[in-house]
Amino acid sequence: MYSFVSEETGTLIVNSVLLFLAFVVFLLVTLAILTALRLCAYCCNIVNVSLVKPSFYVYSRVKNLNSSRVPDLLV
């Protein structure tokens, strides 16, 4: 059977294609990890805004109200 390219050239082409595919897979995996981290940060921000900040506001508000009432109780 006749070959259009030599064995060395064919091996070089195949290795180049496989290296390119490995690079593309690496980029996709990296992109997926970065997207997951961004989603995690977004969800943490939602938890912070919806749970932590209101809880801290209520805590500090009650603490201020209680600290202003303490002298009245001592009198």
Swiss-Prot record:
InterPro entries: E_protein_bCoV, E_protein_CoV, E_SARS-CoV-2. Keywords: Apoptosis, Host Golgi apparatus, Host membrane, Membrane, Transmembrane, Transmembrane helix. It is a single-pass type III membrane protein. Residues 35-75 are intravirion. Residues 61-75 are annotated as: Disordered. The keyword Zinc-finger does not apply. GO terms for biological process: disruption of cellular anatomical structure in another organism; symbiont-mediated perturbation of host cell endomembrane system; viral budding from Golgi membrane. Its main location: host cell. It comes from the Viruses. PROSITE patterns: COV_E. Residues 1-13 are virion surface. GO terms for cellular component: host cell Golgi membrane; membrane; virion membrane. A motif (PDZ-binding) lies at residues 72-75. GO terms for molecular function: identical protein binding. It is found in: Host Golgi apparatus membrane. Plays a central role in virus morphogenesis and assembly. Acts as a viroporin and self-assembles in host membranes forming pentameric protein-lipid pores that allow ion transport. Also plays a role in the induction of apoptosis. Regulates the localization of S protein at cis-Golgi, the place of virus budding. May act by slowing down the cell secretory pathway. May interfere with tight-junction stability by interacting with host MPP5. This would result in disruption of epithelial barriers, thereby amplifying inflammatory processes. Homopentamer. Interacts via C-terminus PDM domain with PDZ domain-containing host proteins such as PALS1/MPP5, TJP1/ZO1, LNX2, PARD3, and AFDN/MLLT4. This may lead to disruption of tight junctions between epithelial cells. Interacts with membrane protein M in the budding compartment of the host cell, which is located between endoplasmic reticulum and the Golgi complex. Interacts with Nucleoprotein. Belongs to the betacoronaviruses E protein family. This is Envelope small membrane protein. It comes from Severe acute respiratory syndrome coronavirus 2 (2019-nCoV). The lineage of its organism: Viruses, Riboviria, Orthornavirae, Pisuviricota, Pisoniviricetes.
